[in-house]
Structure formats: C-alpha cells, structure tokens
Amino acid sequence: MTAQTPIHVYSEIGKLKKVLLHRPGKEIENLMPDYLERLLFDDIPFLEDAQKEHDAFAQALRDEGIEVLYLETLAAESLVTPEIREAFIDEYLSEANIRGRATKKAIRELLMAIEDNQELIEKTMAGVQKSELPEIPASEKGLTDLVESNYPFAIDPMPNLYFTRDPFATIGTGVSLNHMFSETRNRETLYGKYIFTHHPIYGGGKVPMVYDRNETTRIEGGDELVLSKDVLAVGISQRTDAASIEKLLVNIFKQNLGFKKVLAFEFANNRKFMHLDTVFTMVDYDKFTIHPEIEGDLRVYSVTYDNEELHIVEEKGDLAELLAANLGVEKVDLIRCGGDNLVAAGREQWNDGSNTLTIAPGVVVVYNRNTITNAILESKGLKLIKIHGSELVRGRGGPRCMSMPFEREDI
C-alpha cells in the first residue's frame, strides 16, 4: 500500500520508504569533558569519523531504495517567510537559558545576520560560545552580564540531535511532538514544531498532533514503538513517565488513528536502559531482540479505550505468549542480546546490540561491532546490513535511535 498522507507508519517492520536523519555537525565539537554529563554524553566522538560513519549509514539506506531526509534541511525549508524565520529565532532564544539581556541581544544579532536558512539552523544546533560574541560595553551590561561564570557557552550545543528518534515520534498518520526528559534535549523539539507547523509538505495541519511539546510531563520517541496497525508499545522508563503515556494514548484513541490497544512496558530506571528501544526492538513478524537483564523485572500493562476512558489491565504470564497473542502469530521468538553470556549481553547492549532498525520484515540494520548478537540474528534467518559505528555509538544509540521513519509500507 502506498501512503496517501505525509506520515504513514503502522509497523516497526514494514518496508521503509522514507526516513529522517540528522548528520552530526559542529554541535559534536562543542562537547568537552567537564560538561559531558550536562549534555548527556559519556564520551566525545571524533566528528570527522562520525560523519563518515553516518554518511555510510545513510547510503546503506539509499542502497535499499529508501529516501533519506535530513532534519536540518526540513527545518530550514520550514522558515518559509521572514516573519516565521524571526519567530523561530526568538523562540529559540527564549528557550536557551541565556544569562543577561545584553548577551541575548548580541546572540540575536549574530543569528539574524545569517542569511542562509540551513546555515542558521545548523548554527542553532551547534550552540554559541561566549568567545564568538563581541565585547559588550560595560554601560550596556546588566547584573547577569557582569557576573561572569567560567562556563564557555552562551548557548549550549545539542549534540544528541543525531538521535532523531527521540524529539518526536511518528505514529500511524500522526506525530507525537515530545516533551523530553532533560532541558538539554527538550530544545531539540523546536525543530519538529516548525516542521509540522510550517513545512510545505508536513506543516499546515496535514499531520495530526497526538502530543505537544508544551506538556509538563515527559516522553521520548525511543519509548514509542508501533508493533502493528492495531497495537502500540510504550516504555515507562528513565526518560518517559506514566502520566505522559496516559495523555498520549487518550489523544491517539480520540483522533481515531486506527490503534486498538497499547502495551505499556515498565522496566528498570537507569541509563543502561534509558528507552524501551535500547532493550527491545521488533525485527520480523514474530521476532524481537531483547536484553535479558530486563526480563525478570519487566511488568506489562494492556491499555484500551472505551466510553472516553482508558482501561488498564496488568498482564500476567510469559512475554512471548503475550506478544504472540497481540500480534496474531503462533509464537514469538525473543532473541537475547549477547545470547546467554552475561558479559557479552552487558557489553553488546551498552553498544546498542538491541537497538536495531528494521527496514523490511527480517531485514535489519545493525552495528557490526556486536558480533555475538549479530551471529545469533543471522542464525535465526535474518538478513543484516552491518554498519560501522565506533564513533556514533559513543552517544549511546544505535540504528533505530538514529532514524525516524516517515513512511513504511503496510504489512
């Protein structure tokens, strides 16, 4: 089936037709050891090699007939008038936690002077070092301008942007424009707002919104999975809370996007398992990757909607049987990341062995470094497209994290 709407995603495994990426840019070079935790990184990727790896990832998708879109390009194309462009700059500045009126004025002048829209977008992503700004006359400084800190940035970079899965999530024909866990990442959702409001193809109300970035509760796209045209899966995780899920589901059901049930997975709250898709992804009609460490503590709730109310039931019993019953298959194979070896499972999950991108039933993009998990997947009859990711993985995300499907064929 060919999509008749700008967004069409009714599974995790239908043939991928169109996908959104972000090529890592100068924001990566604004990482520094003293502030890694603040920016949600554990290490600093080498940008030149990260870009080569990302370009190879994009080309691997194109080689499979997939149209690759870029976040920075769509955002630039959304600044369709001078008024919208200026509004974007002002909204960006209002969310940037800038210290000092004079500093904010200097940054606004810097951004307004950038004539090319894509260059402007990329600059907002990269952040602004204090050293880039002209010296502000003492007579123009307020108290916050005068009380200088040693922090080198007037505006923080957004180094997590190459994980396009999280700021918004495509669900059916709609989109969840998320309110993210950290202030560092929540600014990323501004690009999605302008794309789905003003872009010639994706804006103007063509795509229903099922969650709004101005909500006070948090949700991220790595916790939103489309298992089938009838069933969604959501994760209650380090980055997504139950209150957000309730709001999301009410909106999805009210907007009649076609879904009948949601499976909510509650699992350990820590950075190793920050999202559902870091421990659980669908790779075929009846196969999933899973990290064995979550299985013991996992709780699953079935959520349906009737008479304008959510109905929630805690599921008991075997996870594979539960998934099989909800997907209408005889049985489900849960493929453990790292197999039965505890050390391999921990290492390969840390390097996103469970975070796979399925581009067609049984055809999966993976990092080549997760050799044990990959061998198990191949032994199950899956076709693997292996990509290098030694620098990309330093951000703690795999092929699914780095991609947001815009169109899949129905299954």
UniProtKB/Swiss-Prot annotation:
InterPro entries, alphabetized: Arg_deiminase (IPR003876)
Keywords from the named record: Arginine metabolism, Cytoplasm, Glycoprotein, Hydrolase
Entry's transmembrane regions: none
Cellular component terms (Gene Ontology): cytoplasm
Active site: 401
Pathway: Amino-acid degradation; L-arginine degradation via ADI pathway; carbamoyl phosphate from L-arginine: step 1/2
Enzyme Commission number(s) of this protein: 3.5.3.6
Gene3D superfamilies (UniProt xref): Arginine deiminase (1.10.3930.10), L-arginine/glycine Amidinotransferase, Chain A (3.75.10.10)
Known catalytic reactions: L-arginine + H2O = L-citrulline + NH4(+)
PTM comment: Glycosylated.
Subcellular location: Cytoplasm
A Gene Ontology biological process term: arginine catabolic process to ornithine
MF terms in GO: arginine deiminase activity
Family label: Belongs to the arginine deiminase family.
Role according to the record: Antitumor protein. Has a powerful and dose-dependent inhibitory effect on antigen, superantigen, or mitogen-stimulated human peripheral blood mononuclear cell (PBMC) proliferation. It may inhibit cell proliferation by arresting cell cycle and inducing apoptosis.
Quaternary structure annotation from Swiss-Prot or TrEMBL: Homotetramer. The recombinant protein is a homodimer.
Name listed for the protein in its UniProt record: Arginine deiminase
